[in-house]
């Protein structure tokens, strides 16, 4: 990742939506919906970056489906059994557990580490790639990835290269978000062109802030603010978010970053935790609305 490229030069407003499972999808949807109700519309950003769970949020934000998805999510949240259909199975094969274990235990994103995770993901006995695309299409619709502002991140499961999908990729929103959300071991890597792509967070970052470097202002929604103590995990090294944010600010970009209140890792893919995520996101948005209204001017 290089901030020297200044991919956001010339942009006034940018936003990046980070990964964090079903919980963070719900939190971000509620946060953005509450901001919109307070007169803060994020849809006008000239660069919208989505990674993993955040790719779904980026897709619905740029396609004008935010309010509809928020209403539907709030309704099904009352019935956790319905949400459970969108979560991965708890009965995992040994090959799935191997890939998932490598991902969870990785405290950095050295190329050899990411390749090992990717190869294990390719070898895992997961549900079909098409099944994940059908699930993401419920959220994104079946349209093309065509918005010029949108960038969806993923990782080549064989080479460990980062791939940034935009309108030129010639794919659908459902396929791009499925690729970005294909957690190693839980979901199959997704075919995009001649590649098999996995979760964009298997890259040492959940927000890819270099893609907005040089923009005048950037809103960053991240699962973590980088201040929590403890070892690295899921290819993210301790303190890496703070390093990434500092590098972005060094390009001249003014940053407003927000994370949810602390949550347990076990809640991230738990359907029963979605009502908590919705309430938390709305509450934090109300607290931030005045400050963000001035920032997002």
Regions found by a protein language model. Give the residues of each.
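Patatin-like phospholipase
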Residues: 1-51, 56-297
């Amino acid at each position: 990742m290089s901030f020297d490229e200044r991919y956001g030069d010339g942009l006034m407003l940018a936003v990046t939506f980070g990964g964090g499972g079903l919980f963070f999808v719900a939190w971000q949807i509620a946060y953005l919906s509450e901001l919109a109700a307070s007169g803060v519309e994020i849809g006008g950003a000239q660069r919208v970056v989505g990674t993993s769970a955040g790719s779904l949020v980026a897709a619905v934000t740029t396609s004008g489906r935010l309010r509809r998805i928020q209403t539907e999510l709030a309704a099904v949240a009352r019935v956790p059994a319905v949400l459970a259909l969108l979560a991965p199975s708890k009965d995992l094969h040994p090959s799935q557990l191997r890939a998932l274990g490598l991902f969870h235990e990785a405290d950095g994103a050295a190329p050899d580490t990411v390749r090992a995770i990717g190869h294990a993901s390719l070898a895992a006995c997961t549900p079909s790639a098409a099944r994940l695309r059908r699930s993401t299409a419920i959220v994104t619709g079946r349209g093309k990835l065509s918005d010029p502002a949108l960038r969806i991140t993923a990782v080549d499961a064989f080479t460990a290269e980062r791939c940034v999908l935009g309108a030129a990729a010639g794919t659908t929103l459902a396929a791009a978000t499925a690729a970005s959300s294909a957690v190693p071991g839980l979901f199959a890597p997704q075919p995009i062109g001649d590649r098999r792509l996995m979760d964009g967070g298997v890259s040492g970052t959940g927000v890819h802030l270099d893609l907005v470097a040089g923009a005048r202002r950037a809103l960053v929604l991240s699962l973590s603010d980088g201040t929590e103590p403890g070892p690295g995990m899921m290819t993210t090294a301790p303190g890496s978010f703070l390093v990434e944010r500092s590098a972005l600010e060094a390009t001249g970009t003014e940053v407003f970053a927000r994370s949810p209140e602390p949550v347990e890792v076990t809640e991230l893919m738990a359907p029963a935790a979605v009502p908590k995520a919705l309430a938390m996101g709305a509450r934090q948005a109300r607290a931030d609305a005045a400050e963000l209204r001035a920032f997002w001017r």
